[in-house]
């Protein structure tokens, strides 16, 4: 038994996924973004139950992934990965629970008028509802109000709308838990049917 902890970050957001696997070694490697995109593209051609073998060459600093009879070899990035655990909140003081489909629709509507340079959307949750608002340089305003469950103090917090939309596209479950502390701390997002995935987005 064993596991793979996969993490990626760009400084503004972070995604972490834990996979239960069979492995015989402990190691930490950094794979280039280009290689990850290529692997992801190729995986779409294989069924979900295809055998995947992952290996690592210490001498050549190569990462090798084999899917059935198909093999990908990539050079690795040398160095140490940032301590991502410092970015993931250990605890949060409030939580918004929102229907994923409703949240996605609301963000898509508001994105039509969002400022294309800053792409900011402000979320203001209350006990049973959440107000979303965005504007652009043409003084156009997009706003919506959706049903949520919220158990925290009054707060308004801004995010890059594209980051929220990206998470919604990949998170598993019918509802999303948005866990927050304050307006300046990273926000934790989890799907109700996705215990192995964690997403963190920094507020604007």
Task: Label each residue range with its predicted role.
Residues 80:
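Glycine-rich, pocket-lining loop/helix-strand segments that form or immediately flank
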């Amino acid at each position: 038994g064993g596991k793979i902890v996969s993490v990626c970050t760009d400084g503004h957001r972070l995604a972490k996924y834990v996979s239960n696997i069979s492995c015989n070694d402990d190691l930490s490697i950094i794979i280039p973004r280009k290689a990850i995109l290529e692997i992801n593209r190729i995986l779409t051609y294989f069924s979900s139950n295809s055998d995947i073998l992952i290996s690592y060459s210490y001498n050549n600093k190569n990462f090798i992934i084999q899917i059935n009879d198909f093999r990908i070899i990539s050079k690795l990035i040398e160095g140490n990965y940032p301590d991502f655990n410092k970015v993931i909140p250990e605890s949060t003081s409030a939580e918004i629970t929102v229907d994923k489909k409703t949240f996605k629709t609301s963000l898509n509507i508001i994105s039509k008028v969002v400022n294309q340079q800053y792409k900011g959307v402000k979320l203001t949750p209350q006990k049973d509802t959440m107000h979303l608002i965005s504007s652009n340089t043409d003084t156009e305003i997009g706003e919506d109000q959706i049903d949520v469950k919220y158990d925290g103090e009054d707060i308004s917090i801004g995010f890059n709308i594209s980051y929220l939309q990206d998470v919604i596209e990949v998170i598993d479950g019918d509802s999303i838990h948005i866990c927050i502390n304050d307006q300046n701390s990273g926000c934790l997002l989890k799907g109700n049917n996705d215990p192995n995935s964690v997403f963190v987005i920094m507020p604007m």
